[in-house]
């Protein structure tokens, strides 16, 4: 969520009015996702967070695309958006590195989040999962990531 505006906050730089409606839509969607009633089942409680994480990802990707791909916003506006927490600075930094262009969330690359000390299964390319399943004679058992609900964010997918 963006920071709360106070008297000490700097005003938005030029160009913010052009992207404000889209950012407002994201904010409304995030509020709606937070208002949803949570389930008492452990599996269902994670799914509520998935929607919030996906909206957070989409908003950060929108700002990333505007600045790095389309070059539609100024550096001042980009820095202000990062400072006001409209986008995730660390996630955008990972997207700029090779191999992480489609990264869904930072939890999926943290090695201490898993039992065996490796990254999340959603980071494994789908072709590799299918090949290993074919060798074993089984179906691919991976459908969604437990952390964020991602269906696969390897850069080769």
Swiss-Prot record:
InterPro entries: BUD31, BUD31/G10-rel_CS. GO terms for cellular component: nucleus; Prp19 complex; spliceosomal complex; U2 snRNP. A motif (Nuclear localization signal) lies at residues 2-11. GO terms for biological process: cellular bud site selection; mRNA splicing, via spliceosome. Its main location: nucleus. It is found in: Nucleus. Belongs to the CWC complex (or CEF1-associated complex), a spliceosome sub-complex reminiscent of a late-stage spliceosome composed of the U2, U5 and U6 snRNAs and at least BUD13, BUD31, BRR2, CDC40, CEF1, CLF1, CUS1, CWC2, CWC15, CWC21, CWC22, CWC23, CWC24, CWC25, CWC27, ECM2, HSH155, IST3, ISY1, LEA1, MSL1, NTC20, PRP8, PRP9, PRP11, PRP19, PRP21, PRP22, PRP45, PRP46, SLU7, SMB1, SMD1, SMD2, SMD3, SMX2, SMX3, SNT309, SNU114, SPP2, SYF1, SYF2, RSE1 and YJU2. Belongs to the BUD31 (G10) family. Present with 1900 molecules/cell in log phase SD medium. This is Pre-mRNA-splicing factor BUD31.
